[in-house]
């Protein structure tokens, strides 16, 4: 057994040295080494998760084609379970209770089904759209990044999928750069919302058939934390959203906001409720 390993490593080492000297150490060579190790492990009947040629000298790891990744779907005994998220591949074998055949998340194994992490669709897989995330909402992009962080923390990173997010050399594609740009925009927007909520806490709200929707402010409305002021209810609009939320505006800013629909932060805007007195502590409206 160990003699065979030494023979394999010696062969691999000589191959890599020759490739480096010849200036041709590219993806094809790494893929060749991985296939050789796979074949050896299959013949030896050992656990294919042993990291022999799977380890790369950089943070790229192994480059998988979609077809190669599909081999790690749990159908072949002895192979580990791999899934991809946003083009990154993780070994989820230790979570076999969740990712094994017939289990809840087996749908994700052997493929990149990033969109399903958001949609919750574990039945339909379309390889043309399964990892096309650019049409998702900003909060969903943040959610996907959170899932990726989870896998990086709790599971073993194995490499990258050649396709939408990474090219044949493992470099980020134009699509991936666009995703990162949209993700940063989403995070900026979320930070703005959090700052707005801290500056203008939410209102209490209730509905009745008789009076419609009632909104009002108290010293704990919004996040439930005690503050020194009560505030007055106003409609808070955010960028690209026709709907509004109720926000409590402090006395010191009330006149300035009502004078011209003051932009409170970025593209957010505060406006008074119709048919409600400027300094009323509660307002009523019907949708």
From Swiss-Prot:
Superkingdom classification of source: Eukaryota
Coiled coil, from the record: 175-204
Signal peptide coordinates: 1-22
Entry note about domains: The cytochrome b5 heme-binding domain was proven to bind heme, although it lacks the conserved iron-binding His residues at position 99 and 126.
Stated family: Belongs to the cytochrome b5 family. MAPR subfamily.
Free-text function comment from the UniProt entry: Heme-binding protein.
Protein name per Swiss-Prot or TrEMBL: Neuferricin homolog
Organism: Drosophila melanogaster (Fruit fly)
């Amino acid at each position: 057994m160990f003699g065979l390993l030494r023979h394999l490593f010696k062969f691999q080492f000589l191959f890599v040295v020759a490739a480096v000297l010849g200036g041709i150490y590219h993806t094809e060579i790494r893929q060749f080494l991985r296939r050789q190790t796979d074949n050896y492990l299959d013949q030896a009947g050992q656990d294919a998760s042993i990291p022999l040629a799977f380890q790369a000298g950089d943070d790229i790891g192994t480059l998988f084609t979609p077809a190669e990744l599909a081999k790690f779907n749990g159908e072949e005994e002895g192979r580990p379970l791999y899934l991809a998220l946003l083009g990154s591949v993780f070994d989820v074998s230790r979570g076999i209770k969740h990712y094994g055949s017939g289990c809840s998340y087996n749908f994700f194994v052997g493929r990149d089904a990033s969109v399903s992490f958001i949609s919750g669709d574990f039945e339909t897989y379309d390889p043309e759209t399964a990892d096309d995330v650019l049409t998702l909402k900003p909060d969903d992009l943040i959610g996907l990044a959170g899932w990726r962080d989870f896998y990086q923390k709790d599971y073993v990173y194995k490499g990258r999928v050649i396709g939408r997010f990474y090219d044949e050399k493992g470099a980020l594609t134009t699509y991936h750069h666009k995703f990162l740009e949209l993700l940063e925009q989403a995070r900026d927007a979320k930070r703005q919302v959090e700052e707005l909520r801290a500056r203008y806490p939410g209102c209490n709200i209730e509905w009745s058939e008789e009076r419609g929707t009632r909104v009002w402010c108290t010293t704990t409305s919004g996040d439930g934390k005690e503050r020194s002021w009560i505030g007055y209810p106003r409609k808070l609009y955010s960028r690209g959203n026709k709907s509004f939320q109720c926000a409590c505006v402090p006395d010191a800013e009330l006149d300035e906001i009502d004078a011209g629909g003051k932009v409170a932060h970025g593209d957010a805007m505060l406006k008074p409720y119709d048919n409600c007195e400027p300094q009323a502590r509660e307002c009523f409206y019907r949708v």
